[in-house]
Amino acid sequence: NKVYDSEVVRFTYTSLISPKAVYDYDMAGRSLEVKKESEVLGGYDKTQYTTERLFAPAPDGAMVPISIVYKKGARKGTPSPLLLYGYGAYGLTSEPNFEMELISLLDRGVIYAIAHVRGGSEMGRYWYEEGRLFDKRNTFSDFIACAEYLVEQGLTSPDKLAAEGVSAGGLLIGAVANMRPDLFKAMVGAVPFVDVINTMLDPSIPLTVIEYEEWGNPNEKDYFDYMMTYSPYDNVKAQEYPNMLV
């Protein structure tokens, strides 16, 4: 609040099932008032949907959070179609916000999940530090661990599992496609960062030098060798891949 001694706190709230809303909380009267809520057309009723937080064990023992949302009745004890989203870079948090475009998928029985992999800051600064530079591969192993956990829990199966990532999340999709193509039916990499080595070796590209802090400087052999282990473009091989949209 801009007024320090105000008795009213104004805040916003959203979740995977709750459209963004602005609230005023009266600290003296202990009352809550909705000031504004984003309109959702089509008769949306959030009581028809459920959201959960799960945790998947990573290979090194870290517990990776997963946010999921689905329409009630979608989990019937048999694997469902599931779309798994991931990013995991720059310390950015993949917030479980309300996304209107997901309603159509949920209404058709699709489960939507966000893998809060290392490289983001969902669990604090250390979560970011453990997903960059020489620890970047944690981002990919975390995502694979989340996918495996969702399959093990019976929420989905490899023939019904799709994955999506954008930009640096597209790097995640490309790396995971090379590492575990058998785990997914389809993968979407939107504006993906897939040619890591050549991009980071070209200082004429505006963002290259400042991004050494995120990926490392491939002009140094240790970084070059490590980046080569996951750069999607450099690890494509003769194997059966999921259906890909790039």
Residue ranges of model-derived segments:
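Non-catalytic accessory segments flanking enzyme active sites
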Residues: 1-78, 92, 97-103, 107-108, ...
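Glycine-rich His-Gly loop
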Residues: 14, 85-89, 167-170
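Conserved hydrophobic/aromatic pocket- or pore-lining residues that grip, position, or stack substrates
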Residues: 22, 56, 66, 84, ...
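Short strand->helix junction
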Residues: 73, 91-92, 120, 133
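Short beta-strand segments enriched for Tyr within beta-sheet-rich domains
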Residues: 80, 110, 183-185
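A fold-wide structural signal in alpha/beta-hydrolase
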Residues: 82, 106-116
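Serine-hydrolase catalytic-loop signature spanning alpha/beta hydrolases and amidase-signature enzymes
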Residues: 88-92, 112
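Active-site-proximal cap/loop segments of hydrolase catalytic domains
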Residues: 114-246
